[in-house]
Amino acid sequence: MIPTTVLSNNVEMPLIGLGTTHSGGYYHDAVLHSIKKCGYRLIDTAKRYGVEKQLGIAVKNCSVPREEMFLSTKLWPVDCGDEVYNAFQTSCEKLQTDYLDMYMIHMPQLPDWIVNQKETKEKTWRQMELLYEDEHVRSIGVSNYSIEDLDELLEFASILPHANQVELHPWFHQADLKNYCDELGILTMGYCPLAKGKYLEDETLCKIASKYQKSPAQICLRWSIQQNVPTVPKSTDCRRLKENTNVFDFELSAEDMNTLNSFSSQNRKIVDLSNICQKMSLPDGYKLNGRVFGVPEEDETIPKSCSKCAQKQNVPLPVCI
Protein backbone atom coordinates (compact mmCIF):
# COMPACT_ATOMS: atom_id res chain seq x y z
CA MET A 1 0.00 0.00 0.00
CA ILE A 2 1.37 3.40 -0.99
CA PRO A 3 1.52 5.72 2.06
CA THR A 4 -0.66 8.81 2.17
CA THR A 5 -0.51 12.40 3.32
CA VAL A 6 -3.40 14.44 4.67
CA LEU A 7 -5.00 17.54 3.17
CA SER A 8 -6.15 20.44 5.35
CA ASN A 9 -9.68 18.97 5.42
CA ASN A 10 -8.36 15.59 6.63
CA VAL A 11 -8.80 13.85 3.27
CA GLU A 12 -5.98 11.37 2.66
CA MET A 13 -4.04 11.45 -0.61
CA PRO A 14 -1.43 8.90 -1.76
CA LEU A 15 2.11 10.27 -1.93
CA ILE A 16 2.80 8.63 -5.29
CA GLY A 17 0.30 8.66 -8.14
CA LEU A 18 0.13 7.97 -11.84
CA GLY A 19 0.49 10.95 -14.15
CA THR A 20 -1.48 10.72 -17.41
CA THR A 21 -0.51 13.73 -19.49
CA HIS A 22 -1.21 13.39 -23.22
CA SER A 23 2.47 13.69 -24.14
CA GLY A 24 3.72 10.27 -25.22
CA GLY A 25 0.33 8.69 -25.83
CA TYR A 26 -2.05 6.57 -23.76
CA TYR A 27 -1.37 2.89 -23.00
CA HIS A 28 -4.33 1.19 -21.38
CA ASP A 29 -2.33 -1.88 -20.34
CA ALA A 30 0.11 0.29 -18.41
CA VAL A 31 -2.67 2.02 -16.48
CA LEU A 32 -4.25 -1.32 -15.52
CA HIS A 33 -0.84 -2.71 -14.55
CA SER A 34 -0.13 0.29 -12.34
CA ILE A 35 -3.40 -0.17 -10.44
CA LYS A 36 -3.62 -3.96 -10.24
CA LYS A 37 0.04 -4.94 -9.90
CA CYS A 38 1.81 -1.88 -8.49
CA GLY A 39 -0.74 -0.56 -6.01
CA TYR A 40 -1.34 2.87 -7.53
CA ARG A 41 -4.51 4.48 -6.22
CA LEU A 42 -3.99 8.15 -7.12
CA ILE A 43 -4.75 8.72 -10.81
CA ASP A 44 -4.04 12.29 -11.87
CA THR A 45 -5.43 13.54 -15.16
CA ALA A 46 -7.09 16.55 -16.77
CA LYS A 47 -9.79 17.29 -19.30
CA ARG A 48 -7.01 18.76 -21.42
CA TYR A 49 -5.21 15.43 -21.77
CA GLY A 50 -8.14 13.84 -23.59
CA VAL A 51 -7.92 10.49 -21.77
CA GLU A 52 -10.62 10.77 -19.10
CA LYS A 53 -12.87 8.30 -20.92
CA GLN A 54 -10.13 5.72 -21.27
CA LEU A 55 -9.19 6.12 -17.61
CA GLY A 56 -12.84 5.66 -16.64
CA ILE A 57 -12.81 2.28 -18.37
CA ALA A 58 -9.56 1.33 -16.64
CA VAL A 59 -10.86 2.25 -13.19
CA LYS A 60 -14.12 0.41 -13.88
CA ASN A 61 -12.29 -2.75 -14.97
CA CYS A 62 -9.44 -2.77 -12.44
CA SER A 63 -11.37 -4.66 -9.71
CA VAL A 64 -10.40 -2.06 -7.09
CA PRO A 65 -13.39 -0.49 -5.29
CA ARG A 66 -13.99 3.13 -6.28
CA GLU A 67 -13.72 4.29 -2.68
CA GLU A 68 -10.14 3.01 -2.58
CA MET A 69 -9.16 5.09 -5.60
CA PHE A 70 -8.21 8.78 -5.58
CA LEU A 71 -9.31 10.35 -8.87
CA SER A 72 -8.07 13.83 -9.66
CA THR A 73 -8.81 15.83 -12.80
CA LYS A 74 -8.64 19.45 -13.86
CA LEU A 75 -10.83 22.21 -15.25
CA TRP A 76 -9.49 23.76 -18.47
CA PRO A 77 -9.71 27.60 -18.50
CA VAL A 78 -12.13 27.74 -21.44
CA ASP A 79 -14.72 26.18 -19.10
CA CYS A 80 -14.54 29.05 -16.63
CA GLY A 81 -17.35 30.90 -14.87
CA ASP A 82 -20.82 29.48 -15.48
CA GLU A 83 -19.40 26.49 -17.38
CA VAL A 84 -17.66 24.94 -14.37
CA TYR A 85 -20.49 22.63 -13.32
CA ASN A 86 -21.08 21.33 -16.85
CA ALA A 87 -17.36 20.68 -17.28
CA PHE A 88 -17.29 18.84 -13.96
CA GLN A 89 -20.28 16.70 -14.95
CA THR A 90 -18.70 15.84 -18.29
CA SER A 91 -15.45 14.79 -16.62
CA CYS A 92 -17.36 12.61 -14.14
CA GLU A 93 -19.32 10.95 -16.94
CA LYS A 94 -16.14 10.15 -18.82
CA LEU A 95 -14.44 8.85 -15.68
CA GLN A 96 -17.56 6.82 -14.82
CA THR A 97 -17.83 8.25 -11.33
CA ASP A 98 -20.36 10.40 -9.50
CA TYR A 99 -17.74 12.27 -7.48
CA LEU A 100 -14.10 13.33 -7.66
CA ASP A 101 -11.51 13.10 -4.94
CA MET A 102 -9.92 16.30 -6.18
CA TYR A 103 -10.94 18.84 -8.82
CA MET A 104 -8.40 21.48 -9.78
CA ILE A 105 -8.26 24.60 -11.92
CA HIS A 106 -5.59 23.69 -14.47
CA MET A 107 -4.17 27.18 -15.06
CA PRO A 108 -4.49 30.62 -13.45
CA GLN A 109 -4.68 32.21 -16.92
CA LEU A 110 -7.96 32.73 -18.74
CA PRO A 111 -8.55 32.93 -22.50
CA ASP A 112 -7.84 36.34 -24.00
CA TRP A 113 -11.45 36.71 -25.12
CA ILE A 114 -12.65 36.91 -21.50
CA VAL A 115 -13.27 40.62 -20.90
CA ASN A 116 -13.73 40.72 -17.11
CA GLN A 117 -10.83 38.52 -16.13
CA LYS A 118 -10.81 39.02 -12.36
CA GLU A 119 -14.59 38.80 -12.08
CA THR A 120 -14.54 35.56 -14.07
CA LYS A 121 -11.77 34.12 -11.90
CA GLU A 122 -13.85 34.90 -8.82
CA LYS A 123 -16.96 33.30 -10.33
CA THR A 124 -14.94 30.25 -11.36
CA TRP A 125 -13.57 29.71 -7.88
CA ARG A 126 -16.99 30.20 -6.33
CA GLN A 127 -18.31 27.43 -8.57
CA MET A 128 -15.46 25.22 -7.38
CA GLU A 129 -16.39 26.02 -3.78
CA LEU A 130 -20.02 25.08 -4.48
CA LEU A 131 -18.94 21.70 -5.85
CA TYR A 132 -17.07 21.13 -2.60
CA GLU A 133 -19.85 22.42 -0.36
CA ASP A 134 -22.39 20.22 -2.16
CA GLU A 135 -20.08 17.21 -1.68
CA HIS A 136 -19.59 16.53 -5.38
CA VAL A 137 -15.84 16.65 -4.74
CA ARG A 138 -13.82 15.70 -1.69
CA SER A 139 -11.28 18.48 -2.24
CA ILE A 140 -10.58 21.38 -4.58
CA GLY A 141 -7.30 22.75 -5.78
CA VAL A 142 -5.36 24.76 -8.30
CA SER A 143 -2.45 24.02 -10.60
CA ASN A 144 0.44 26.11 -11.87
CA TYR A 145 -0.39 28.95 -9.46
CA SER A 146 2.41 31.29 -8.42
CA ILE A 147 2.52 33.27 -5.17
CA GLU A 148 0.99 36.20 -7.04
CA ASP A 149 -1.80 34.01 -8.42
CA LEU A 150 -2.56 32.69 -4.95
CA ASP A 151 -2.60 36.21 -3.53
CA GLU A 152 -5.21 37.18 -6.10
CA LEU A 153 -7.27 34.11 -5.24
CA LEU A 154 -7.13 34.94 -1.54
CA GLU A 155 -8.87 38.25 -2.22
CA PHE A 156 -12.17 36.47 -2.89
CA ALA A 157 -11.84 32.84 -1.77
CA SER A 158 -14.09 31.61 1.04
CA ILE A 159 -12.40 28.20 0.92
CA LEU A 160 -8.67 27.96 0.31
CA PRO A 161 -7.39 25.43 -2.22
CA HIS A 162 -6.51 22.14 -0.63
CA ALA A 163 -3.60 21.71 -3.04
CA ASN A 164 -1.50 23.53 -5.62
CA GLN A 165 0.01 21.23 -8.23
CA VAL A 166 3.14 22.65 -9.84
CA GLU A 167 6.27 21.52 -11.64
CA LEU A 168 8.62 20.39 -8.92
CA HIS A 169 11.90 18.46 -9.03
CA PRO A 170 15.43 18.99 -7.65
CA TRP A 171 16.35 21.30 -10.53
CA PHE A 172 13.26 23.47 -10.03
CA HIS A 173 11.94 23.08 -6.51
CA GLN A 174 10.20 26.45 -6.03
CA ALA A 175 11.04 26.65 -2.32
CA ASP A 176 9.47 30.09 -1.82
CA LEU A 177 6.19 28.94 -3.35
CA LYS A 178 6.12 25.73 -1.32
CA ASN A 179 6.87 27.63 1.90
CA TYR A 180 4.07 30.07 1.12
CA CYS A 181 1.63 27.22 0.50
CA ASP A 182 2.74 25.58 3.74
CA GLU A 183 1.94 28.77 5.65
CA LEU A 184 -1.56 28.81 4.15
CA GLY A 185 -2.20 25.12 4.75
CA ILE A 186 -2.20 24.40 1.00
CA LEU A 187 -0.53 21.11 0.10
CA THR A 188 2.04 21.35 -2.68
CA MET A 189 1.72 18.58 -5.27
CA GLY A 190 4.44 17.96 -7.82
CA TYR A 191 4.31 17.08 -11.48
CA CYS A 192 7.23 16.34 -13.81
CA PRO A 193 9.15 14.99 -10.77
CA LEU A 194 11.88 13.45 -12.93
CA ALA A 195 12.35 16.54 -15.12
CA LYS A 196 11.37 14.32 -18.07
CA GLY A 197 14.55 12.33 -17.47
CA LYS A 198 16.78 15.10 -18.77
CA TYR A 199 19.21 15.11 -15.85
CA LEU A 200 19.02 11.56 -14.47
CA GLU A 201 22.62 10.95 -15.54
CA ASP A 202 23.87 13.86 -13.43
CA GLU A 203 27.08 12.71 -11.76
CA THR A 204 26.19 13.95 -8.28
CA LEU A 205 22.71 12.45 -8.47
CA CYS A 206 24.12 9.11 -9.59
CA LYS A 207 26.57 9.08 -6.66
CA ILE A 208 23.70 9.62 -4.22
CA ALA A 209 21.70 6.87 -5.94
CA SER A 210 24.62 4.46 -5.66
CA LYS A 211 24.95 5.24 -1.95
CA TYR A 212 21.37 4.10 -1.29
CA GLN A 213 21.39 1.36 -3.95
CA LYS A 214 18.50 3.07 -5.70
CA SER A 215 18.02 4.49 -9.18
CA PRO A 216 18.43 8.22 -9.86
CA ALA A 217 14.68 8.39 -10.53
CA GLN A 218 13.92 6.89 -7.12
CA ILE A 219 16.17 9.47 -5.47
CA CYS A 220 14.23 12.28 -7.17
CA LEU A 221 10.90 10.82 -6.09
CA ARG A 222 12.15 10.28 -2.54
CA TRP A 223 13.31 13.91 -2.47
CA SER A 224 9.71 14.96 -3.22
CA ILE A 225 7.85 12.73 -0.80
CA GLN A 226 10.34 13.40 1.98
CA GLN A 227 9.09 16.99 1.82
CA ASN A 228 5.49 15.74 2.04
CA VAL A 229 4.94 16.54 -1.64
CA PRO A 230 2.70 14.00 -3.43
CA THR A 231 3.99 13.52 -6.93
CA VAL A 232 2.67 11.95 -10.14
CA PRO A 233 5.36 10.51 -12.44
CA LYS A 234 4.20 9.18 -15.79
CA SER A 235 5.49 5.90 -17.17
CA THR A 236 4.30 3.17 -19.52
CA ASP A 237 7.06 0.75 -18.53
CA CYS A 238 6.11 -2.06 -16.11
CA ARG A 239 9.47 -2.11 -14.40
CA ARG A 240 9.55 1.64 -13.91
CA LEU A 241 5.95 1.78 -12.73
CA LYS A 242 6.87 -0.60 -9.91
CA GLU A 243 10.23 1.07 -9.29
CA ASN A 244 8.52 4.41 -8.79
CA THR A 245 6.58 3.01 -5.82
CA ASN A 246 9.65 1.51 -4.12
CA VAL A 247 10.72 4.73 -2.46
CA PHE A 248 9.36 4.23 1.03
CA ASP A 249 12.02 1.87 2.42
CA PHE A 250 14.79 4.43 2.84
CA GLU A 251 15.33 8.04 3.86
CA LEU A 252 17.70 10.60 2.41
CA SER A 253 20.10 12.19 4.88
CA ALA A 254 19.89 15.90 5.60
CA GLU A 255 23.19 16.34 3.77
CA ASP A 256 21.90 14.60 0.66
CA MET A 257 18.65 16.55 0.76
CA ASN A 258 20.66 19.76 0.87
CA THR A 259 22.78 18.60 -2.06
CA LEU A 260 19.66 17.87 -4.10
CA ASN A 261 18.18 21.21 -3.08
CA SER A 262 21.28 22.94 -4.44
CA PHE A 263 20.47 21.67 -7.95
CA SER A 264 17.69 24.25 -8.09
CA SER A 265 20.25 27.04 -8.44
CA GLN A 266 20.40 25.91 -12.08
CA ASN A 267 16.68 26.85 -12.39
CA ARG A 268 15.98 24.24 -15.05
CA LYS A 269 12.25 24.57 -15.59
CA ILE A 270 11.02 21.90 -18.00
CA VAL A 271 7.42 22.83 -18.84
CA ASP A 272 7.07 26.07 -20.81
CA LEU A 273 3.73 27.75 -20.08
CA SER A 274 4.65 31.13 -21.54
CA ASN A 275 2.41 30.77 -24.59
CA ILE A 276 -0.40 28.79 -22.97
CA CYS A 277 -3.07 31.36 -23.83
CA GLN A 278 -2.38 30.85 -27.54
CA LYS A 279 -2.99 27.11 -27.12
CA MET A 280 -6.19 27.22 -25.09
CA SER A 281 -8.50 26.72 -28.05
CA LEU A 282 -6.66 23.65 -29.35
CA PRO A 283 -8.64 20.40 -29.01
CA ASP A 284 -8.26 18.33 -25.86
CA GLY A 285 -5.70 15.58 -26.23
CA TYR A 286 -4.14 17.14 -29.32
CA LYS A 287 -0.71 15.82 -28.31
CA LEU A 288 -1.96 12.22 -28.41
CA ASN A 289 -1.85 12.21 -32.22
CA GLY A 290 -4.01 9.07 -32.22
CA ARG A 291 -1.64 7.18 -29.93
CA VAL A 292 -4.28 5.47 -27.79
CA PHE A 293 -3.52 1.78 -27.37
CA GLY A 294 -5.03 -1.23 -25.66
CA VAL A 295 -8.54 0.05 -24.86
CA PRO A 296 -10.96 -2.94 -24.89
CA GLU A 297 -12.57 -3.53 -28.26
CA GLU A 298 -16.11 -3.45 -26.86
CA ASP A 299 -15.69 0.23 -26.03
CA GLU A 300 -16.31 1.35 -29.59
CA THR A 301 -17.05 4.94 -28.62
CA ILE A 302 -13.36 5.62 -28.02
CA PRO A 303 -10.98 6.27 -30.92
CA LYS A 304 -8.17 3.82 -30.29
CA SER A 305 -5.70 1.27 -31.52
CA CYS A 306 -5.24 -2.07 -29.80
CA SER A 307 -1.88 -3.19 -28.46
CA LYS A 308 -1.31 -5.45 -31.47
CA CYS A 309 -1.90 -2.48 -33.78
CA ALA A 310 0.65 -0.52 -31.81
CA GLN A 311 3.19 -3.27 -32.39
CA LYS A 312 2.37 -3.44 -36.11
CA GLN A 313 2.91 0.31 -36.35
CA ASN A 314 6.27 -0.07 -34.58
CA VAL A 315 5.06 2.02 -31.67
CA PRO A 316 7.19 1.33 -28.57
CA LEU A 317 5.01 -0.54 -26.08
CA PRO A 318 7.20 -1.36 -23.09
CA VAL A 319 4.34 -2.62 -20.93
CA CYS A 320 3.19 -6.04 -19.81
CA ILE A 321 0.43 -7.19 -22.15
Swiss-Prot record:
The active site is at 49 (proton donor). Its EC number is 1.-.-.-. It is an enzyme of class 1 (oxidoreductase). GO terms for molecular function: aldose reductase (NADPH) activity. The record marks 74 as: Lowers pKa of active site Tyr. It holds the Pfam family Aldo_ket_red. InterPro entries: AKR (IPR020471), Aldo/ket_reductase_CS (IPR018170), NADP_OxRdtase_dom (IPR023210), NADP_OxRdtase_dom_sf (IPR036812). The keyword Oxidoreductase applies. Signal peptide: none annotated. CDD domains: AKR_CeZK1290-like (cd19135). Substrate binds at residue 106. GO terms for cellular component: cytosol. Keywords: Oxidoreductase. Belongs to the aldo/keto reductase family. This is Uncharacterized oxidoreductase ZK1290.5. It comes from Caenorhabditis elegans.
